[in-house]
Amino acid sequence: MTFELQHTDTASDARTGIITTDHGQIRTPIFMPVGTVGSVKGVHFSELRQQVQAQIILGNTYHLYLRPGLEVLRKAGGLHGFNTWDRPILTDSGGFQVFSLTGIRKLREEGCEFRSHIDGSKHIFTPENVMDTQRIIGADIMMALDECPPGQSDYEYARKSLGMTQRWLDRCIRRFNETEPLYGHSQSLFPIVQGCTFKDLRREAAKFVADKGADGNAIGGLAVGEPKEAMYEMIEVINEILPKDRPRYLMGVGTPQNILEAIERGVDMFDCVMPTRNGRNAMLFTYEGTMNMRNKKWEMDFTPIDPDGCEIDRIHSKAYLHHLFKAQELLAMQIASIHNLAFYLRLVTDARQHIEQGDFVTWKRSVIEKLGERR
């Protein structure tokens, strides 16, 4: 994997670039649809390519490890062979999912013991077997195993947790370097910066990660309950230290406003389940604000869902989508999910264009307030 930094905004830390993988190029800033179990909920890959114009998707190591399992994935030739997605894939380490399973996991130096949410069977994730698992999945970009402490953790816990994450990172790197890709395409490993909302811990973590010289770096443990101002402050602290010639990935973020604020602060890559989750619940993101398609106000509105959006937005009316949600038709959730994903991709594409034009900050200010309105 390589990263070419193309343009840096003169009025902010926003930048554009190109990530090149063996499965294709990714133009940054980029939003990555979440395909937890190897599929993006309710959206076929043909629609991801043509309507959404997704350049890369995510898979989840925890879920794929449990089902379909490593034997199936290895025999299929990895996730690319299994689901036939022919563009880049990033997998998270599964750590966030394991640590969110409070009451059914046990953390220790070796790794994290947990019980399957499917059948209750016992498992352990270690830095070594998480690297092995992601080799079998075959993602273009692999994530290191880390502990993601709760957003309101006290300093002592955050300090201990960061130490564990750093020791695990060293073990991940060692195992990654000891093993080879299985399917003929290269793979890259991204470390993750943790440290809650403590500036000194975030600085220490960013320096530790930067010294590893990885192909790219991730920022974890944000958007987990802390005020958004604290999240933006942590991004600034971290990006002062992370190398400028490597892509920066903000994990699990977020709203359109969050994404624009993070782009302004030098972040390149984003993922979040919000576009599809909110879409399934009749909430549509637009430049004019968020629309609840169950509201009666749309019943007689025969204008396009979004006249500037993807083809599906242009051919279907708000009234039709309102009807589908009232009738509880599955197509409603599909259309809304496609719209939201396409909007997120359009948002980062527009951001890229304005960074290159030199007016990103002015453009961001002109759109960000409306993005948060309810219609």
Go through the PLM ranges and name each one.
Residues 129, 133, 160, 164-171, ...:
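A non-catalytic, amphipathic alpha-helix used as a structural packing/dimerization or gating element
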Residues 24, 57, 92, 134, ...:
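Conserved, mostly hydrophobic/aromatic
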Residues 1-20, 26-33, 41-42, 146-152, ...:
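C-terminal extensions of enzymes
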Residues 65, 150-151, 225-226, 278-279, ...:
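Short secondary-structure capping/turn micro-motifs that flank functional sites
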Residues 139, 170, 174-177, 240-243, ...:
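Generic secondary-structure signature for well-ordered alpha-helical cores
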